From Swiss-Prot:
It comes from Bordetella pertussis (strain Tohama I / ATCC BAA-589 / NCTC 13251). The gene is eno. InterPro entries: Enolase (IPR000941), Enolase-like_C_sf (IPR036849), Enolase-like_N (IPR029017), Enolase_C (IPR020810), Enolase_CS (IPR020809), Enolase_N (IPR020811). Its EC number is 4.2.1.11. GO terms for molecular function: magnesium ion binding; phosphopyruvate hydratase activity. The active site is at E205 (proton donor), K338 (proton acceptor). It catalyses: (2R)-2-phosphoglycerate = phosphoenolpyruvate + H2O. This is Enolase.
Length: 428
């Protein structure tokens, strides 16, 4: 038995300089696991609740001392003596201890830190890499990275409404090659932006935030960077969008400041997205409709769902109950997986499994506020999710995940496969 003998919670800072929760779990054998949790900027209204102190005199109210206190008292007492190898039981204990649907009492940030640290301690004791501890000894696929190279919306202070414009190296032969392609396009894009007299400062997730004239101008800039880096748009490197539409959906309309302030109905916005998909090699759209616009989501899915990956982030918030409803209604064809949206590893894995059984893809994702913790890289490989979204090709908090994936691919050697377009099995 891998008995838990000590749990230590602490307040640390994330990549935006805001407090977050870190947890150490020590086992009787001397094995130790450490984990820290991320935090989002644009959040779905049904996400599990991260506990913040609200004391404006300290970190502008964003301190997490209450969550840390919960870790060091209630959570510690409840998990002490439990077998760290029994992840499902550990997570069920956390869920029952909290007693709320949204994890608002103990805080999803406190609960997730404990859940992840327990898993890391158990892997350490087993002498296994974390991805092998999660996924067993079977064959595993490396994920196709969705690389956020131009930021807008809540992630930037520019004219773009859409939150992320991404490149996807679908034609690469390996993850290592995909990462190289992405880095080369990133640096070419930086040169093009600089040559046009725009800022090359990067945002929270490492992407650029230039003041371009329109969304299509941003897309065309990326396509030029792909071409000038020596790659073929579409066949080698495809495009993806994260609209984060809930951020500009008001009173039943999608108001696009970056498109001259036009206000569009759900059908009109779906038509606009469809037009872009016809003109450009866009194969993935995240949150193409607002989280509460289920009729709009159905319109979009019926219109594009057979040829474009439609990812529900704010829509599903990594929650199996909401995902099940979406599957039943034929809404979207993919789910974004953010571990802090749901608050435990067990629930995270359940969402991935439910999606795959329904023929939906699962995209494992970071948050805009990250740490050096690279657990999501191991999760993406262990679950054969085949897609990961973990930022651009700058900022060490993003590189931590990419570099971990390089190590995993090296360790797997010839057993590692890179799926490319096969990762998009939801497209028919």
């Amino acid at each position: 038995m891998s008995a838990i003998v000590d749990i230590i919670g602490r307040e640390i800072l994330d990549s935006r300089g805001n407090p977050t929760v870190e947890c150490d779990v020590l086992l009787e054998s001397g094995a130790m696991g450490r984990a820290s949790v991320p935090s989002g900027a644009s959040t779905g209204s049904r996400e599990a609740i991260e506990l913040r102190d609200g004391d404006k005199g300290r970190y502008l109210g964003k301190g997490v001392l209450r969550a840390v206190e919960n870790l060091n008292t209630e959570i510690s007492e409840a998990l002490m003596g439990l077998d760290a190898q029994e992840q499902t039981f550990v997570d069920r204990t956390l869920i029952e201890l909290d007693g709320t649907d949204s994890k608002e009492r103990l805080g999803a940030n406190a609960m997730l830190a404990a859940s992840m640290a327990v898993a890391r301690a158990a892997a350490d004791e087993s002498g296994l890499s974390l991805y092998r501890y999660f996924g067993g000894s079977g064959p595993m696929s490396m994920p196709v990275p969705m690389m956020n190279v131009i930021n807008g919306g809540a992630h930037a202070n520019n004219t773009l409404d859409l939150q992320e414009l991404m490149i996807l190296p679908v034609g690469a032969a390996s993850f290592r090659e995909a990462l190289r392609w992405g880095a080369e396009v990133f640096h070419m894009l930086k040169k093009l932006i600089h040559d046009q007299g725009m800022s090359t400062a990067v945002g929270d997730e490492g992407g650029f935030a230039p003041n371009v004239a329109s969304h299509e101008a941003a897309i065309q800039l990326i396509l030029k960077a792909i071409t000038e880096a020596g790659y073929e748009p579409g066949t080698q490197i495809a495009l993806g969008l994260d609209c984060a539409s809930s951020e500009f959906y008001r009173d039943g309309k999608y108001t696009l400041a970056g498109e001259g302030g036009v206000s569009l109905s759900s059908q009109e916005f779906a038509n606009l997205l469809a037009t872009w998909c016809d003109k450009y090699p866009i194969i993935s759209i995240e949150d193409g409709m607002a989280e509460n616009d289920w009729d709009g989501w159905k319109l979009l899915t019926d219109q594009l769902g057979k040829k474009v990956q439609l990812v529900g982030d704010d829509l599903f918030v990594t929650n199996t109950r909401i995902l099940r409803e979406g599957i039943q209604k034929g809404v979207a064809n993919s789910i974004l997986i953010k571990i802090n949206q749901i608050g435990t590893l067990t629930e995270t894995f359940a969402a991935i499994e439910m999606a795959k059984r329904a023929g939906y893809t699962a995209v494992v994702s970071h948050r805009s506020g990250e740490t050096e913790d690279s657990t999501i890289a191991d999760i993406a490989v262990a679950t054969n999710a085949m897609q990961i979204k973990t930022g651009s090709l700058s900022r060490s908090d993003r590189m931590a995940k990419y570099n971990q994936l390089l190590r995993i691919e090296e360790e797997l050697a010839e057993v590692a496969s890179y799926p490319g377009l096969e990762a998009f099995y939801n497209l028919r």
